[in-house]
Amino acid sequence: MSFKMTQSQYTSLYGPTIGDAIRLGDTNLFATIEKDFANYGDEATFGGGKSVRDGMAQNPNVTRDDRYVADTVITNAVIIDYDKVYKADLGIKNGYIMKYGKAGNPDIMDDVDIIIGASTDIISGEGKIVTAGGIDTHVHFINPEQAYVALESGVTTHIGGGTGASEGAKATTVAPGPWHIHRMLEAAEGLPINVGFTGKGQAHNHTALIEQIHAGAIGLKVHEDWGATPSALSHALDVADDYDVQIALHADTLNEAGFMEDTMKAIKDRVIHMYHTEGAGGGHAPDLIKSASYPNVLPSSTNPTLPYTVNTIDEHLDMVMITHHLNASIPEDIAFADSRIRKETIAAEDVLQDMGVFSMVSSDSQAMDRVGEVITRTWQVAHRMKEQRGYLDGDKEYNDNNRIKRYIAKYTINPAITHGISEYVGSIEEGKLADLVIWDPAFFGVKPEMILKAGMINTAVNGDANGSIPTSEPLKYRKMYGQYGGNLTGTSITFVSNIAYMNDIERQLSLHRMVRPVKGIRQLTKKDMKNNSETPKLDVDPQTYEVFVDGKLITSEPAKELPLAQRYFLF
């Protein structure tokens, strides 16, 4: 016996279906469902009088040993990823993504590929959005509280360096030498996120670099505050090629040892992660931005310049002075800071992100920007660029899927690929760690509802513990059981170099977290950056600092008002 209902009735019960559009927060972006795995009338839903009951959508016979039986199912969720906007059930088993598809009881339902049994828990995803956990690849490990702030924004992986509130850590993403690297690997045992640490990349003696890779560093950071000379950079890249790790570069702002072209000659055709490629965060003044046109450069932005607003320029001078230990009474220090802040290149940066020329977004946590705003600022840029540049090719009214896929890739899959961890995290694909973020669409990009780490609920919005219901105010982010006991170490990964992994760094340091090697880095090119692989010719006028793409001037107007901003932070 069939039953008919209106589209609005269906959506209120089971969430949007194919062809429906969802507004993301208070932005001007709309995600349209491309595919729905549901069989209408056979949706799995939990609750009183709902279908997930014994003998109905829950199979009464299967045990957990059946490989199709999930530990957890997120029902009827909208999955937004770099390659899809799907409506599906999402199965999790042993902490990994088992499958997205149709969940239920195959004895009485068609097309079931995720079985709900007595060992299965349910998270209701009706009307919710699920994304992969974000990855921030420019983290100064200055303060361990950064991990919790990042988690509450939807970021589940941190890559960078530092040792606490030292001057070196405040200025450079470096954990220098085996002793510091080992201590940070041990400290990570108490953090609720995935981590990987970068060592110091300045040494003409290869042995001084190699020992850091053996100690567990997943790459090296070459930073101008330690000396970003072409020679130091070339030596670091030699070691990276031998050990399949990444080099992250904060280039030479003062052009002391050479210009942008000299740096590129030292790099040759070797892959490199170019930090804050616009240049306000540091790097060859005024034309570091040109490096984004090279096929071996994987360019990222840090978020202080994203998006370009009426306040951006004024904010930057003090940030540069404090972060890089400069003295306001020394004219040369003031000149150094001023040389990095150019409204013309900052205005071009948003456009280059929108064109897919810049591939990633990161934070530069406490060292020129905010660890909890990577995701928010990414979507603010997407909103501003739609306002100023219109639809991307293939998009149309109530369907911004191409732009959405481009921007979500910037803080999920592309950082994972760049640092050799995409086998484990970075997207919603079978076999990857179930690091998942669940959003109410009205709060998308700014305040997630729940964060899962390796399939365990790690952080969630929840009410007063003495309340009669879980929504008793005050509603706020609270640690869940994924952060307690053995789950703290059992649900997060510490990434290390392959040589450290092969030498059993886990046993050497008595680490209890999952330890996994980075891999597949040195053969990368910009073509591997999902939805963000453009390499047009870039030029910068040395007098006006205007930026040209294939000979055409690009710029944007500073925003006076943004979405995902004050209306979400009244309390």
From Swiss-Prot:
Q: Which CDD domains match?
A: Urease_alpha
Instruction: Recount the PTM note.
Output: Carboxylation allows a single lysine to coordinate two nickel ions.
Keyword Ribonucleoprotein present in the record's keywords: the answer is no
The enzyme class is hydrolase
Q: Which GO terms describe its cellular component?
A: cytoplasm
Q: Where does Ni(2+) 2 bind?
A: K221, H250, H276
Documented EC number(s): 3.5.1.5
The biological pathway it contributes to is: Nitrogen metabolism; urea degradation; CO(2) and NH(3) from urea (urease route): step 1/1
Binding-site positions, substrate: H223
Q: Which residues carry this modification: N6-carboxylysine?
A: K221
| Cellular compartments annotated | Cytoplasm
Tell me where the transmembrane regions lie. Answer: none
Q: Name all Urease domain ranges.
A: 133-571
* Free-text comment on the cofactor: Binds 2 nickel ions per subunit.
A molecular function (GO) term: urease activity
Catalytic residues identified in the record: H324 (proton donor)
Name the cofactor(s) required for activity, per the record: Ni cation
Question: Which family is this protein grouped under?
Answer: Belongs to the metallo-dependent hydrolases superfamily. Urease alpha subunit family.
Q: Subunit details for this protein?
A: Heterotrimer of UreA (gamma), UreB (beta) and UreC (alpha) subunits. Three heterotrimers associate to form the active enzyme.
Name under which the protein is recorded: Urease subunit alpha
This chain's source organism reads: Staphylococcus carnosus (strain TM300)
Name the gene behind this protein.
ureC
